[in-house]
Swiss-Prot record:
Compartment(s): Cytoplasm
Record keywords: Cytoplasm
Major location (coarse): cytoplasm
NCBIfam families: PRK02302.1 (NF002631)
Highest taxon above the source species: Bacteria
InterPro entries registered for this protein in UniProt: DUF2129
Protein name (database record): UPF0298 protein Sez_1612
Species assigned in the record: Streptococcus equi subsp. zooepidemicus (strain MGCS10565)
GO cellular component, one term: cytoplasm
A Pfam family the protein falls into: DUF2129
Family statement: Belongs to the UPF0298 family.
Lineage: Bacteria, Bacillati, Bacillota, Bacilli, Lactobacillales
Length: 94
C-alpha cells in the first residue's frame, strides 16, 4: 500500500534569479519569488540534513531556512468565535 512520505519545506534565498534552475535538482519547486529572489522547495524529511548542507555550500545561495510549518499546532478544539469583553468599571477618583 502507498506510504505517505514525510516532507519538509526549505526557503532558499538567492543572489540572482538565474540560479534557480540549479537548485531544482534537490527537491520539488513549490514557489519562486522573482522579486524577492527566494525559492520554496519541498524535500523528503529523511534527506533533510544532507541536502541542507549541500544547498548551503552552493556559492549562489545567500541563506537557507527550514520551514516551521510542522511546529504549528493545527488542532482547533472548541469554539473559535470570541466573545467581546465586557467593559470594566473605572475606579472613581476623588
Amino acid at each position: 500500500m502507498f506510504q505517505k512520505q514525510q516532507r519538509i519545506g526549505l526557503v532558499i534565498y538567492l543572489y540572482y534569479n538565474r540560479d534557480a534552475r540549479k537548485v531544482m535538482k534537490y527537491g520539488d519547486l513549490y514557489y519562486h519569488s522573482r522579486r524577492s529572489r527566494y525559492l520554496v522547495i519541498y524535500i523528503n524529511k529523511e534527506d533533510m540534513e544532507e541536502k541542507l548542507k549541500d544547498i548551503s555550500r552552493l556559492t549562489f545561495v545567500k541563506e537557507v531556512k527550514v520551514s516551521a510549518f510542522d511546529d504549528i499546532d493545527c488542532d482547533f478544539v472548541g469554539n473559535l468565535h470570541r466573545e467581546p469583553l465586557e467593559p470594566q468599571a473605572l475606579p472613581e477618583q476623588g
